[in-house]
Structures are given as C-alpha cells and as structure tokens.
C-alpha cells in the first residue's frame, strides 16, 4: 500500500537511534526513546490559502529532518512504521 499525503502533510520514516551507550551498554527497544529525526518519504502538494492559492511544501523526498518528540501521527504500512506530520511541526532540515 502506498500513501500520498494531503495538503501540507509530510510522511517521514524515523531514523534508527544508536542502541548502545558510549560505554558499550546495549539499550533494549522498550527503554529506548523514539528518535526525533527522520527521512522524508513523501510530501503533499501544499497548504491551501483562504483565496484558493496553494503554498507548496518547502521539503522534498530524501530530506533528513528534525521534529518534536510528540509530533505527528504514527501509522504502520506494510509492517513499516511511518510518521504523518504537518510541515509546521518540522523544526529543521539536516544538511
């Protein structure tokens, strides 16, 4: 199944966090925090203004982004966990 985001929404795949501490202790999945960065998979057409114009999203597929810990809505597609997030919830693009 493929997802096509609507309006100013962006689909992001979370990037894996390091599962070991600097001293070599392995962190189990149940104790690890969800990462707050990811890769943009798909981008909606943009936000519609009151006068009907569409403001395009300032991101593209492949961009690495930072977002808030509680941003967006998690969905599972074909066993893969993705995040549907509004453009204004994305804090920065990693360059």
UniProtKB/Swiss-Prot annotation:
Predominant localisation class: cytoplasm
One Pfam family hit: Cpn10
SMART domains: Cpn10
Presence of keyword Methyltransferase: no
Alphabetized GO MF terms: ATP binding; metal ion binding; protein folding chaperone; protein-folding chaperone binding; unfolded protein binding
Gene Ontology BP annotations: chaperone cofactor-dependent protein refolding
Annotated coiled-coil segments of the chain: none
Annotated keywords: Chaperone, Cytoplasm
CC per GO annotation: cytoplasm
Subcellular location: Cytoplasm
Similarity field: Belongs to the GroES chaperonin family.
Subunit structure: Heptamer of 7 subunits arranged in a ring. Interacts with the chaperonin GroEL.
NCBIfam families registered for this protein in UniProt: PRK00364.1-2, PRK00364.1-5, PRK00364.2-2, PRK00364.2-4, PRK00364.2-5
Role of this protein: Together with the chaperonin GroEL, plays an essential role in assisting protein folding. The GroEL-GroES system forms a nano-cage that allows encapsulation of the non-native substrate proteins and provides a physical environment optimized to promote and accelerate protein folding. GroES binds to the apical surface of the GroEL ring, thereby capping the opening of the GroEL channel.
Protein name in the entry: Co-chaperonin GroES
Species lineage: Bacteria, Pseudomonadati, Pseudomonadota, Betaproteobacteria, Burkholderiales
